[in-house]
Regions:
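Short, well-ordered alpha-helical segments in soluble proteins
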Residues: 137, 141-145, 234, 296, ...
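Conserved short-loop catalytic and cofactor-binding motifs
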Residues: 37, 121, 199
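Acyl-thioester-dependent acyl-group transfer interface
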Residues: 1-73, 81-108, 117, 203, ...
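Secondary-structure transition/turn motif
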Residues: 77-82, 120-124
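Acyl activation and transfer enzymes in specialized metabolism, enriched
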Residues: 41-59, 119-135, 203-240
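Short, well-ordered loop/turn elements at secondary-structure boundaries
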Residues: 111-113, 216, 221, 245
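Conserved catalytic core of two-metal-ion nucleotidyltransferases
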Residues: 76-77, 165
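Non-catalytic, low-complexity flexible loops and terminal extensions
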Residues: 1-17, 112-115, 124-132, 136-213
Length: 333
């Protein structure tokens, strides 16, 4: 597979609407790299994991690319280099992606004991796209580690795995969406400042069945339940239940695929904001949860989500903005 990599067909493609922003704003402190992990019941064999990555990467056009700089926009080009090396985890997670140290790829695969880690520069894909790739990587690894699996399941991608790379923002864009994002200064949590590239991690494990039951009792979804708990925790631990002239704001990513019948493996999400304005003392948890849930439900619907991303796409399609050289775009983005 590694010998064949140099003969891959060279293709180029545009970044999706959201992806255009990430190469411009990525820094050592705000890397725009996310991590997905999967834990097996056995120790990881790094050589087999490398073989699995070598095998599936050419199948995923959304991951098998390098980032190029054009006159007006960044763009993707097929990466003909061998797949990035699988490494034993030894650094902070979610470090800034350094393509020149990674065969020009924009993702990393590492392992630690029984865990497989996939770190992705958001320019490639959102969490759902990353999950698709990680699941197939794990499946291929298990086929290599346990050949009897091939006898039962075959040596091919799951029928549920999408390789679609459409820009679903452009496909579902609707003209005449005048509203943009509204923002205001929000309350900022304070704490010990880590050095650049350092990343603090707190791992918590919850029994899914009990979380589902707790959310069901309160007539909310799991996402709404966790968002409400998070907002209430900030309110109690940082504001101590006091009045604040700055609101507590949660930015919640929403997977747009179910609303627009998309199966893309690229970015297709929108951000909505749930705002708690502490204009009185001692909100109860129920009161905070009600405010957060109502804010989310008002925004997480097809009509509102369509307006959000259509506004962004309209800026990208603006002829005057498209004609501005990339070097100038980077100064204002």
């Amino acid at each position: 597979m590694r010998e064949q990599s140099s003969r891959r067909e060279l293709k180029w493609s545009r970044l999706d609407n959201t992806a255009n922003l990430f190469p411009v704003i990525a820094t050592e402190r705000m890397t725009n790299v996310y991590r997905l992990s999967l834990t097996l019941d056995e120790e990881i064999d790094p050589e087999l994991l490398q073989q699995a990555l070598d095998k599936i990467l050419p199948l995923f056009d959304s991951m098998n690319v390098r980032l190029r700089t054009g006159a007006f926009w960044y763009y993707f080009e097929t990466n003909r280099k061998p797949a990035p090396r699988v490494e034993r985890e030894s650094e902070y997670p979610c470090r800034k992606m350094e393509p020149q140290l990674n065969n020009q790829y924009l993702f990393r695969v590492s392992y630690y004991k029984k865990r497989i880690n996939l770190e992705v520069f958001h320019v490639l894909a959102d969490g759902m796209g990353g999950v698709t790739f990680l699941k197939e990587l794990a499946c291929q690894y298990l086929r290599l580690a346990h050949p009897e699996i091939c006898d039962e399941m075959g040596d091919h991608l799951s029928e549920l795995t999408s390789l679609n790379t459409e820009d679903s923002y452009l496909k579902n864009f609707r003209k005449g969406q005048p509203k943009g994002y509204k923002s205001e200064p929000a309350f900022h949590m304070k704490g010990e400042k880590l050095r650049d590239s350092a990343f603090g991690v707190i791992q918590g494990y919850l029994p899914l069945a009990q979380v589902k039951e707790a959310a069901h009792r309160r007539n909310v979804s799991i996402n709404e339940y966790l968002a409400g708990v998070y907002a209430y925790s900030i309110y109690r631990e940082y504001l101590h239940g006091a009045v604040s002239d700055k609101p507590v704001v949660l930015c919640v990513p929403v997977n747009l695929r179910p609303y627009f019948e998309s199966i893309t493996t690229r970015n297709f999400f929108a951000m909505v904001s749930a705002v708690l304005r502490p204009d009185q003392e001692d909100y109860t948890r129920d009161e905070v949860e009600k405010i957060i849930v109502e804010a989310l439900r008002q925004q997480i619907n097809k009509e509102h989500l369509e307006k959000l991303f259509s506004y962004n796409v309209s800026n990208q399609k603006n002829l005057m903005l498209r004609a501005v050289p990339l070097v100038l775009k980077k100064l204002v983005m």
